[in-house]
Amino acid sequence: MIACFIGDSRMEGLYFYGDLKEADFLYKPGATVYDIMNIKLSMNGGGSCLLTDVLSGKQYSHIYMMVGVNELGDRTPDEYAKAYSNDIETIRQLQPDAVIFIIGMMHVTTQYSNSSDVFNNDNIDARNTAAASIANGRDIFYLDMNECVDDGVGGVIGDYSYDGVHLKAEYYKLWTEWMKAHGIKNLIK
């Protein structure tokens, strides 16, 4: 395995429905930048393990991480970026040769965004901007996957989501195809 994907329930969806068979996935619904290094995550749909244990025992060439939706109401974008940066630094220490991709947090639907003071696309954009600042253009990069599910006004297309936050199963392949079209087609299958 050359690629590892890390995240919350949205990454879990990518594991189950994104058709990325040759990558490892570590995820937990509800995971945040504040706890992802200290909680047990599911690995490839199986047993649970600590992220640091997996990253200590196996080297990856590329690591993709997306978290953020669960902590939208917790702390400021700058505090979020600091915690994310600390997580990335821990990953870097355990994976010195890996290229790390921070995947920008997926928006919610416009309808969902308009109905929430916390879980809305303005808050997501503020945190995505903060997370993007961690990228260094050498071995840490930022990817904004929102364009593959965008409704034209900054939200996920309503029909693509079953709850306003998560994609329906059939739309995770759009995310996979977007990633393959943006320079990583030889890394994931």
Name each model feature, range by range:
Residues 108-189:
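Catalytic His-Asp segment of secreted/periplasmic serine-dependent ester chemistry enzymes
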Residues 1-83:
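Conserved SGNH/GDSL esterase-like catalytic core that processes O-acyl groups on lipids
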Residues 87-91, 135:
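Hydrophobic positions in alpha-helices of CheY-like receiver
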Residues 78-87, 124-127:
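Charged helix-capping and loop-helix junction motifs
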Residues 26-29, 103, 143-148:
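Conserved beta-strand termini and adjacent loop/short-helix elements that scaffold enzyme active sites
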Residues 95-99:
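A short helix->loop->beta-strand "cap" motif at the edges of active sites that frequently abuts
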